[in-house]
Amino acid sequence: MPMVRIKICGITNTEDARAAAAAGADAVGLVFYRSSPRALDAVRARKILAALPPFVTRVGLFVNAEAADVAATLQQCPLDVLQFHGDESPSLCRGFGRPYIKVLRVTAAQDLRPAVDAYHDAQGLLLDCAAPGVWGGSGRSFDWWRLPDLGKPLILAGGLHAENVAEAIAIARPYAVDVSSGVELSPGRKDHDKMARFVARVRGT
């Protein structure tokens, strides 16, 4: 099985960013969604991005943001990939000249082909648990199933932590996994030991 990539999301400070990279994360996520306890402004985000070493992908998470707000963030922050967590249209997602990931909110096995077709130019699709009234990551898991080969990288998120990620990977066989609350001490504050254990469990699959 190919190596499963790892993204640690909800980074809010330089210390956690460096620790995520040192643990072996392939990507880190910064949240630009004001209602999130992990939300950042551009000034803080720039400091975090500057602290990351080379070859760590910098992902910016947005939820139903206005196109002008996304563009303004991109002018100030050197993001590599955009992640859209709301009801964004394909035309909005592709309108910034950056690779993007579209999040799909799911509860169990479903046909992913319509989303693959609609967001055909997405770099990947991220599957997160659908929770009423919750945007930007629910922290809840859903019933994993064997993900189909649709010619598009599929990323697994939602309620993952060191104790269940190996099982999730064995069942779903995703391209990558995405974790936030599962490696935290409190919302927005990462537990460096949990991050290291999570990465070790993924690398051990």
From Swiss-Prot:
An annotated Gene Ontology molecular function: phosphoribosylanthranilate isomerase activity
Keyword Nucleotidyltransferase: no
GO biological process: L-tryptophan biosynthetic process
Enzyme Commission code(s) on record: 5.3.1.24
Pathway(s) this gene product operates in, as recorded in its UniProt entry: Amino-acid biosynthesis; L-tryptophan biosynthesis; L-tryptophan from chorismate: step 3/5
A Pfam family this chain is assigned to: PRAI
PANTHER family per record: N-(5'-PHOSPHORIBOSYL)ANTHRANILATE ISOMERASE (PTHR42894:SF1)
Family designation: Belongs to the TrpF family.
This protein's name: N-(5'-phosphoribosyl)anthranilate isomerase
Species in which this protein is naturally found: Acidithiobacillus ferrooxidans (strain ATCC 23270 / DSM 14882 / CIP 104768 / NCIMB 8455)
